[in-house]
Amino acid sequence: NLPLTKQDNGQAVPCWTISNNQIIIVIMDIERILKTRENAIYYGIGEYQKDCFGWVGGNAPACFDDKYLSDKDNLYFYLTFQNPLNPNKQISIFTPDFDIALEYNTYPDCKLLLVEHELSSQSKSDRYKHPEIDEIYSIYEMSTEKDMPEKNCAIKFGGNVMPIQWGLDNDGKVVKDGNSFIFQINEICMKDISVFMAGCIYVYGKIEGNKVTNPFVAYWEYS
C-alpha cells in the first residue's frame, strides 16, 4: 500500500507526523490528482546527481543486488523515482529483452515489471544494467499543474491518461477490470534513451480510499 504523505518546505513528511488539517490538504491533493484528475505531478530529467533517489539508465538501486527478479526472462533496469504518495518508497521499472517486451506489450500480459521498495541509492553492481542504455539522468519533480504539455515531461503522475496509439483503447481494457490510471512514462522526452521506440509506459492500480494498491505496468505503446 502507498500511504499518504505531505510535502513541507520541500521535505517529505509521513502523514503520521502532521496535523489533521495538513492531512486534509494532502487528501485534497490526492483527490485532484487521482480522482477528479484536475491536476498531475510532472517530472523531468537532467544531469545525473549522485545520492538521488530518481534516475533513468545506469545501475539498479542497491537493494536489488541480492534479489533474483525472474525465473524465465532476463530483466534489465529502466528507471526509478520516489513515490510522490510516499516519499519513503521508490518505484522501479524493469524490462525484459526487447523482442519479449514487444510481443507482450498489452494488458493483461505485459512483461514489464514494477517494484515498489525502500529508498535505495544506485548500486555499484551492473547486474541489472540495460545493455542499450549508455546514458544516465536524474529524475526530478517539475511542477503540479493542470494540463501541462505531456511532451515536456518524462513522467506524468495522475491526471488523465494520454495514449499515443489512438484507436487501441488500451486504457478501456484495463479500467474495465476495476483498475485506475496512476502514471505514465514518456520516453520521447528522454534524450538519448529509446528502449521503447520513443513510446510510453502506462501504470495502473487500485485506488482504495486515499491509497493506491497493487500498482503494475499494464501496457506500453510506441510512436
Explain the meaning of each model-derived region:
Residues 7-11:
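Short Gly/Ser/Thr- and charged-rich N-terminal loops/segments
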Residues 26-223:
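Preference for intrinsically disordered or flexible, low-complexity segments
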Residues 12, 24-26:
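Compositionally biased low-complexity segments, especially N-terminal hydrophobic helices
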